[in-house]
Amino acid sequence: MKEIGPAWIDEYYLTFDYYSSSREAGAANLKLLASGMAATPGALFEIDEETLEALDRKEGHPNPKYYQRKIVTAYTADGKAHQAYTYIHYATENNFHPPSQEYEALIRNGLNRLELTTNWLDDALGNSMNAKFEHVFVYGTLMKGMPRHSEMQDGCTLVCEGTVQGDLYQISDYPGLVVGSGTVQGELYRASDMFQIIQRLDWIEGAGGANPLFNRVIQEVTTEQGQVWAYAYHYAKPTDSLEKIISGDWLSFNE
């Protein structure tokens, strides 16, 4: 088993609604809520078939009394989407079973090692839902001084400037970010209601559906205030015929 690194799963939140008889305490689980309302940080690993079989045995898959193996999308720091297995127990009741101190420490130490927030863990331990995935990174026409910036003024507050890893291309009168080795300049915003904001931004960016123009991903943003994970929109079409913006800066490209 090889660790790839920190990653996020969108739409799911951490909970302790499963009682583990072997641990004699609660065990971590995931529950589906909605994009913009929940997300869960963790670690992404590359595994082989032998390891997968061992994990299935450990988690009790496919016995419905225990955890079920499910394919989800995990996003790494560069915004790349990975199809990954995770294990979810589909509890029929909204129970809360506190974990042991050792089990909690195991999760917390893992998050700290990967420099990931423990807010969602703390909420799960308190059986509450106060944590928010509240940041979005923009790098084109939604930035200050650009034609669609007004869309960010309703419900979003500028936090600071930032950069993400990737390559930037000129699509038309707007740019597109793709996974790459370059650095792309942009702005980080905090949303007052991310669920509502992404409904609007998804429509603007043509995200979702069977033939999207952009895909909304989760990506790590580098700022003067530190590293922040945020939603960002990646161009979903081929870039072979497009001009690459070497500077990674849409504002300076348009001066």
What is each residue range found by the language model?
Residues 1-255:
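A glycine-rich, hydrophobic/aromatic-adjacent loop/helix-cap motif
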